[in-house]
């Protein structure tokens, strides 16, 4: 929706105002920003944003789904992009969906250990996908692991999100550290910032077209009898 140029200028503006981009376990104050990216659709879009952040000297926190129906994080291409994001200095971790499991704790451990083994990382914080019901029932750690909706990362921080394509640029424009009473927990989904469009549906339709082209190409590559 907003485009990579807009993402760049938004981050540059925050840096000019002396905000400091850091991780969730640093000594946080009102000038701190914990930049979080939940990857719901496109690993390639995540990589595009990660490159810009690297060039601007900041580090972000990227969370990838193992249970996604829209991308496979361990396909050869996606795994390569995720590893590149990590090598750029960003933190990579698990975007866990508690809504798909009856035994949340057991399957959380399975996903966490799988992610750690595949990508060679140690996970100390995860983000939650569709967290509402989980948070209604309890706001607790997952088998001793922190998550981004715990009170210390949510209620005790100013939370700002572009979920569903919400335009948060005006909110960020008027923020300055001296006016903040809490650190900023900033959730940005790369898909809203890598293409230009007038509304969320247009962005998603554009993504769907790319996915369709990709699936046609993969089908032809995997089955020689397929005719486009």
Segments predicted by a language model, with ranges:
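Terminal accessory/targeting
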Residues: 1-61, 65-80, 86-89, 99, ...
């Amino acid at each position: 929706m907003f485009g990579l140029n807009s993402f760049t200028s938004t981050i540059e503006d925050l840096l000019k105002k002396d905000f400091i981009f850091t991780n969730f376990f640093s000594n946080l104050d009102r000038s701190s920003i914990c930049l979080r990216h939940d990857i719901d659709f496109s690993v390639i879009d995540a990589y595009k944003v990660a490159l810009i952040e690297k060039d601007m000297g900041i580090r972000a926190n990227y969370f990838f789904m193992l249970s996604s129906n829209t991308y496979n994080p361990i396909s050869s291409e996606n795994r390569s992009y995720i590893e590149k994001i990590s090598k750029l200095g960003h933190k990579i971790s698990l975007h866990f969906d508690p809504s798909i499991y009856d035994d949340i704790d057991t399957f959380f451990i399975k996903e966490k250990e799988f992610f750690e083994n595949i990508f060679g990382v140690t996970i100390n914080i995860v983000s939650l996908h569709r967290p509402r019901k989980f948070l209604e029932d309890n706001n607790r750690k997952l088998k001793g692991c922190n998550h981004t909706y715990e009170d210390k990362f949510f209620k005790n921080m100013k939370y700002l999100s572009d979920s569903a394509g919400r335009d948060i640029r005006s909110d960020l424009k008027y923020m300055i550290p001296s006016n903040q009473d809490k650190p900023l927990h900033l959730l940005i989904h790369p898909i809203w910032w890598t293409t230009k469009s007038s509304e969320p549906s247009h962005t998603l339709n554009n993504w769907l077209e790319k996915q369709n082209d990709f699936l046609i190409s993969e089908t032809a590559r995997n089955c020689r009898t397929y005719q486009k």
